[in-house]
Amino acid sequence: MSALDVDSISDIAPGLSPVTAIHYGRIQVMLFRSHLAEFAEEDLVYAMDNSVVVFGEEALLMVAPDESSIAICTYPFGLMMMEWGNWDILAVSPPSRTPTIPSESVLGISNQGGANVEQQEQSSHTIDMTLPSNFFEQSSVTQSNGTSRPRNQFVLYYQWLLDTLFSEDPSLSARNISQIVAGLWNSEHPAAKARFRELAEMEVHRHRAENPHLYPDQPRFPTTDPVPPRMRYPCVISPEDRQRILRMLDFVWEESNGQLAAEEAALNDVVQPQQAEEVGPFPDFEWEEPNHIIDMSTDLSVAQDPDFMMTEDDSMRFLLKQAS
């Protein structure tokens, strides 16, 4: 397993309090603790590879060698790996004000029993790349007021797999770990996801108990109370009031029924068409041919009925009358 050599620096960058220098392969990064609340231009100190790492009061500032990217890490972050291009920087938590070399508690190094002073000094100058097991005991995501947020189900799942992934491949970057954990979470069994949801709810309850000032008594959103607020205090009606209400309802019902019947009758009168008068059968009159009309097809030379006989003068007179 790769390791980092830590050397103390005491004669570099006068005016700043040096902390330590980290050698990782060909890269050498110098860490300096700044006494200013904000970073100023004089706080930036260039190392051998022109990369800049500066400790602030509450943050760690890192600038890439080509000055194309800047990263700021807030405390506490323990041992964190940050990726820039094709090389990594491992930074340590800020040590105490008095010593110049990081203490064992800060670096997470356990002192073996029976070791001499030289072995202890040599072990204090080595930082293991493996993250400590208690690195994610508290969430590093903070709210605007500085209080850590409760961890959700995915964050708990991420932290549960982190030690296993680092033990299998210590060279994994944060981006690769996030991609791997996301793929495992999407293919995880629903029962396992339900278990992590329960753990997340327990985390919320713990966070509520530790930070009651963040949870006011009156919630902003409606709760999932099985009993609605309108059912918590049942309405009690006396028998006298009940009878009075029933009589009022009967009166209103009768009035509404009468008004409804009148409206229906008026509507039926308007909509229903008037019935037509009945017409009797057409009378069957006998056709009587008038006797003064002569059929032109009748042969006058043939003997006719004496009642219908006409003289020649009558016939001529009739024809002239018809012609005029």
Curated annotation (Swiss-Prot):
InterPro entries: HMG_box_dom, HMG_box_dom_sf. Residues 147-215 bind DNA. The lineage of its organism: Eukaryota, Fungi, Dikarya, Ascomycota, Pezizomycotina. It comes from Neurospora crassa (strain ATCC 24698 / 74-OR23-1A / CBS 708.71 / DSM 1257 / FGSC 987). It holds the Pfam family HMG_box. This is Mating-type protein A-3. Gene3D superfamilies: High mobility group box domain (1.10.30.10). It is found in: Nucleus. One of its GO terms (molecular function) is DNA binding.
